[in-house]
Amino acid sequence: MASKAFTAHGDHIRLTVRLTPNGGRDAIDGVEAAADGDEHLKVRVSAVPEKGKANQALLAFLAKKLGLAKSKLSLISGETQRKKILRIEGDPEDLIRRLAELAGR
């Protein structure tokens, strides 16, 4: 089942992430619903949140997990916030299926 955390948009998907920087390890902790009902993918990275290091680590980690080039992922919003929206280029059906598997859905 598709999650509101990832939505298809033509030739890409939008992924909502709640990032925990300095999280001890790089990991996907599943999909979680916020108090307002919006869902997001919980991701932690070991990088520190300074000078964009955590954002770069997030993009590199997700690219590796999805088997994509890092250039296929971009940050749309949330550069300095925990909640981020990413654009991931590729076949939306395939990307959503892979993300659901990674999130344990």
Regions found by a protein language model. Name each.
Residues 59:
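Generic structural marker for isolated residues within well-ordered, non-membrane alpha-helices
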Residues 1-51, 56, 74-78, 85-105:
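Contiguous, often N-terminal, cationic amphipathic patches that form binding interfaces
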Residues 70-72:
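Short acidic capping loops at alpha-helix termini that bridge into adjacent secondary structure
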